[in-house]
Amino acid sequence: MTTLSVGIGGLLGVLARFGIGRLTLHHEQLLWSTVWINVSGSFLLGLFVAGGWFGRDLREGIGVGFLSGFTTFSTFSVQAIQEVDAGEPWRAFAYVAVSLVGGLAAAAAGYALGRRLA
């Protein structure tokens, strides 16, 4: 059952990510939508890991499946390199800084909230 829940969760996460990507028509919108996706995914993963709610199958379906399919480190990495290549090193720096600091802060906030609610 865990394999099935991870597969279904992953499919739903990828579809959600794809849908948001289709809504962002311009390069700059895509860049910041990736930040939003990764930061919100970090918060939710922290929340679910610390909260310990649900059974193992659903937790892994959400965490390993949906949130892993929804968030994307590879897109983050390539977009940062593309900004540098386009002559926008400061935009690349801001993108990386906001992504990393925002992701860590969101994960910490989600984790703290999950522990408090558990």
Q: What kind of feature is each model-predicted range?
A:
Residues M1-A118:
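Membrane-interface helix-loop junctions in multi-pass transporters/channels
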